[in-house]
Amino acid sequence: ELADELRHVSLSGGKRVRPTVTVLACETAGGSPEDAVDFGVGIELVHNASLVVDDIIDQSEVRRGTAAAWSEYGYGPAIVASDGLLGEAFALFSSDPQAMQIVSEAMVELGEGEATELAAQPTNEHEYMELARRKTGALFRAAAELGAVAADADAYTVEALGEYAERVGVAFQIRDDVLDATADADDLGKPTGQDAEMDRPSVVQVTDLTPAEANERAKTEANAALDALSTVDGGNTDAGEYLEDLARFVVVRER
């Protein structure tokens, strides 16, 4: 049954943005995509594990157009599935101490972000941006840094790609908040209006920004990501160009 639960969570679709970042970062840093596959799978499993918990906290019954794990199997089995995903993920990172450190630090940031969202909600734009960095940016950063590590990149390249991805992650979260407030649930593949219904901090709820102004903030983050990427030697490769495209895409996506 646990295997069914793991398959339900990990094979139910999704954008697979984080593993894509891992593979592209590896190529941009001079590595082969094959070198980054394990790390890419691992970071997606970590992300999926966090979504299981998110859905329990939010009481969201739908994820990626299908039943959320807790809705399908119950709270206990869903939590066990989340633990199982993390176990599988760390098995993929365990051969590389640097990878273990990167992911562990990202998970601490992610946990702090979730705790902040529940217990000490942000009250202004600055606090919101810090929440977005922890809640979403940290795992994006880890995805890119893992790719750079897989390519045996130097510390400067690891940091530059990490900065790029963290900024993309923040832009992604801002756009996610805007979509929650403005998109159609069927188009988005998950319930909308959740932030307002649950009094959950979002860029729309916390600040006085209109959706259009929030989108501009997302574009500012995307531009900062592009600036960071421009300092990487491999930024003009095909993989680097795909990373550029991603930074531009996350702020205009519709789901």
Functional labels for PLM-detected ranges:
Residues 1-255:
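All-alpha prenyltransferase/terpene-synthase fold signal
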